[in-house]
From Swiss-Prot:
Species assigned in the record: Thermoanaerobacter pseudethanolicus (strain ATCC 33223 / 39E)
GO cellular component terms given for this protein: cytosolic large ribosomal subunit
Keywords associated with the record: Methylation, Ribonucleoprotein, Ribosomal protein, RNA-binding, rRNA-binding
GO molecular function, one term: large ribosomal subunit rRNA binding
CDD domains named among the record's database cross-references: Ribosomal_L11 (cd00349)
Coiled coil: none
Subunit text: Part of the ribosomal stalk of the 50S ribosomal subunit. Interacts with L10 and the large rRNA to form the base of the stalk. L10 forms an elongated spine to which L12 dimers bind in a sequential fashion forming a multimeric L10(L12)X complex.
Protein name, UniProt field: Large ribosomal subunit protein uL11
Record InterPro entries: Ribosomal_uL11, Ribosomal_uL11_bac-typ, Ribosomal_uL11_C, Ribosomal_uL11_C_sf, Ribosomal_uL11_N, Ribosomal_uL11_N_sf
This protein's record includes keyword Cell division: no
High-level lineage: Bacteria, Bacillati, Bacillota, Clostridia, Thermoanaerobacterales
PANTHER family linked: 60S RIBOSOMAL PROTEIN L12, LARGE RIBOSOMAL SUBUNIT PROTEIN UL11M
Amino acid sequence: MAKKVAAVVKIQLPAGKATPAPPVGTALGPHGVNIMAFCKEFNERTAKDAGLIIPVVITIYADRSFSFITKTPPAAVLLKKAAGIESGSPQPNKQKVGKITREQLREIAEIKMKDLNASDIEAAMRMIAGTARSMGIEIV
């Protein structure tokens, strides 16, 4: 028989740097999950993605066990990394803060493809391009 799901928690954590301190402790503590076990497993799985923010969906079962799925980093994080900027533009239509090439846009779309609701790579590229525009990043 399948385990009974008690809760589903979604949080974004830096890859390889999960600690029992907030936000992990405050999200998992009330559910009685072994926080250190989660941190250890998460850090092992995401060590290769150091420096990126990784969204994670944690399914907590009634017997206090858990399983989790890591998603791809948010498009905004990947765009900032590709453009070499710290943050997006405060006025995206007036003030451009960075540039990326179509090739970089395609790479980001390929990374994000499995998490996007897009049927082909061109549709995914258009979605990522929209995010870039709203951040003040120009596509050349």
